[in-house]
Amino acid sequence: MDPIPHSITRTLSRFRTELTSESGSLAIHELEVSEYKASASLRYLACLVVLPWVIPISLRKGLEPWVTNWWNTVKSQKIFDYLQEQNALGRFEKIEELFLLERMVEDSLGTHSQSIRIEIHKETIQLVEMYNEDCIQIISHLLTNLIGFAFISAYIILGKNKLAIINSWIQEFFYSLSDTMKAFLILLATDLCIGFHSPHGWELMIDSISESYGFAHNERIISGLVSTFPVILDTILKYWIFRRFNRISPSLVVIYHSMNE
């Protein structure tokens, strides 16, 4: 006589089979979900890299005709008079000086050109057209940058989950390295961004951003930002490294400071 009834053994066998099949299907489902999250995160990262280049080009092509029509029909030149006044006056002065010099040379040679006033008038009209085109370009770039910045910010906020997945990949890769390699990568990144040879890069970046938003080149403001912003960023970064890695890996902090010295 069997100590255990066949009904119980069949029930246990069926339960074990169902449990095994459910665990297998659950593992397959988790694998499919992981693959979907990985592909979605990679597509999101690719879009995040491409969009800052594509959006300004497409927006500028659509906005420039509208801005040109608005600028030429509406009496709105006063909006940007202050921004471009010095440049326009400087160009007028250069034209005037050149034609005065030409007239002095002609007088010294005993020749009198009757067309000098016509030439001055033509150059003045050309200068006004250039000034008008510069103002249109400034408005187009300003609107393009503002709309593009708002779009990218919304895209980043809406993709927090995908950014969290990418961040977990980066952290997993970073923490799998040795402390020496971690310190080397941190030192390389900090030297490229805020090292002793980075002020020229900061000057170019700040100048490019200011011009794209319609601000005239100002050497004092650029020098002030270059001399203060990288120092503040370097201090914040060192404090973050000390607070974050001093508890996780004290040896990394020691190696980093040794390599930095």
Swiss-Prot record:
Keywords: Antiport, Chloroplast, Hydrogen ion transport, Ion transport, Membrane, Plastid, Plastid inner membrane, Potassium, Potassium transport, Transmembrane, Transmembrane helix, Transport. One of its GO terms (biological process) is potassium ion transport. It is a multi-pass membrane protein. One of its GO terms (cellular component) is chloroplast inner membrane. The chain crosses the membrane at residues 39-59, 138-158, 184-204, 221-241. GO terms for molecular function: antiporter activity; proton transmembrane transporter activity. It catalyses: K(+)(in) + H(+)(out) = K(+)(out) + H(+)(in). It comes from the Eukaryota. It holds the Pfam family CemA. It is found in: Plastid, Chloroplast inner membrane. Belongs to the CemA family. Contributes to K(+)/H(+) antiport activity by supporting proton efflux to control proton extrusion and homeostasis in chloroplasts in a light-dependent manner to modulate photosynthesis. Prevents excessive induction of non-photochemical quenching (NPQ) under continuous-light conditions. Indirectly promotes efficient inorganic carbon uptake into chloroplasts. HAMAP family: CemA_PxcA. This is Potassium/proton antiporter CemA. It comes from Pinus thunbergii. The gene is cemA.
